[in-house]
Amino acid sequence: MKLGIFFSVFFLAMIHSCLSETNEDKNLESYFREDDLKALSFGEYARAMMAESRKDNCIPKHHECTSRPKDCCKQNLMQFKCSCMTIIDKNNKETERCKCDNSIFQKVAKTSVNIGKAVVTK
């Protein structure tokens, strides 16, 4: 029973992740004409999406994104999120620092996959 609940929650989380679109996913279609999109196979379209997501102006994982919080790169199917924290230095001055990292949902999904793999392989 517990295993069934676990996999149903995991399945719903993966469906949610796959169906959620970012603005970049919607804007990708503007780079291609409609005829080009019809002519591309799924593999070619996926490669084009990955090439577009690796553009030079995106911020890689664990790099600072304080000035550009929406420019974090994508990795595989998931977009990094800019997570911020307040840091107090030696002079008791508060500054906000941000870095591109996986969101909480992505961390939970990745952990669920790892646990699922461990359960299946045993």
Swiss-Prot record:
Tissue expression: Expressed by the venom gland.
S-S bonds: C58-C73, C65-C82, C72-C100, C84-C98
Cellular component GO terms, alphabetical: extracellular region; membrane; other organism cell membrane
Single Gene Ontology MF annotation: toxin activity
InterPro entries: Spider_toxin_CSTX_knottin (IPR019553), Spider_toxin_CSTX_Knottin_CS (IPR011142)
Annotated signal sequence range: 1-20
Keyword Signal: yes
Principal location: secreted
Source taxon at top rank: Eukaryota
GO biological process: defense response to bacterium; innate immune response
Protein keywords: Antibiotic, Antimicrobial, Disulfide bond, Immunity, Innate immunity, Knottin, Membrane, Secreted, Signal, Target cell membrane, Target membrane
Pfam families: Toxin_35
Location(s), subcellular: Secreted; Target cell membrane
Propeptide position ranges: 21-47
Functional note: Potent antibacterial peptide with anti-inflammatory properties. Inhibits both Gram-negative and Gram-positive bacteria by disrupting both the outer membrane and the cytosolic membrane of bacteria. Also downregulates the expression of pro-inflammatory mediators (cyclooxygenase-2 (PTGS2/COX2), nitric oxide-induced synthase (NOS2), IL-1 beta (IL1B), TNF-alpha (TNF)) and upregulates the level of anti-inflammatory cytokine (IL10) by inactivating mitogen-activated protein kinase signaling in a lipopolysaccharide-stimulated murine macrophage cell line.
Record comment regarding domains: The presence of a 'disulfide through disulfide knot' structurally defines this protein as a knottin.
Family per record: Belongs to the neurotoxin 19 (CSTX) family.
Name recorded for this polypeptide: Lycotoxin-Pa4a
Organism encoding this protein: Pardosa astrigera
